[in-house]
Amino acid sequence: MHRVTITLDDDLMERLDAIIAVRGYQNRSEAIRDLARIGIQQTSAHDSGERCVGAMVYTYDHSKRDLPRKLTQSFHNHHDLSRATMHVHLDHDQCLEVTILDGKASELQHFADHIFSERGVRYGRLVTIPTMDDEQHTHD
């Protein structure tokens, strides 16, 4: 482990201390390590061949012409990435889906971009977490 010194302006330090208090970190080093991991993962993982798991969250208008069929077809075309999906009816027209994905980061990002760009998908976000080992667990 390396010891480093950083300089932060007062406003940023106050915001960091607020995060530390809310999340219950024992010290600033733990918080900064977590924030650094998150920042590195967000900037590099989506374009890599690194294996990861992810949660794809999006809302869509199910009454848009052919959208449910297009989404279903996309999931069948990417069945190797999708592990499970939870579907929630938010109101008469709006649905929320949360899908757990597993695969290479670049493939997950490509799939999510495809889903999010469909007409009628209103909001989408992909959160990925790199996995430590390259072995896939199967239930065969």
Swiss-Prot record:
Entries under Gene3D superfamilies matching the protein: ACT-like. Chain A, domain 2 (3.30.70.1150), Met repressor-like (1.10.1220.10)
Binding locations of Ni(2+): 76, 87, 89, 95
Transmembrane feature ranges: none
Cofactors that this protein relies on: Ni(2+)
Keywords: DNA-binding, Metal-binding, Nickel, Transcription, Transcription regulation
Pfam families documented for this protein: NikR_C (PF08753), RHH_1 (PF01402)
Cofactor note: Binds 1 nickel ion per subunit.
Entry annotated with the keyword Ribosomal protein: no
Coiled-coil regions listed in the entry: none
GO molecular function: DNA binding; DNA-binding transcription factor activity; nickel cation binding
Domain of life: Bacteria
InterPro entries on file: Acetolactate_synth/TF_NikR_C (IPR027271), ACT-like_dom_sf (IPR045865), Arc_rbn_hlx_hlx (IPR013321), CopG (IPR002145), CopG/NikR_regulator (IPR050192), Ni_resp_reg_NikR (IPR022988), Nickel_NikR_proteobac (IPR014160), Ribbon_hlx_hlx (IPR010985)
Any one biological process term the GO annotation gives: response to nickel cation
Similarity comment: family membership: Belongs to the transcriptional regulatory CopG/NikR family.
Function recorded in the entry: Transcriptional regulator.
Protein name: Putative nickel-responsive regulator
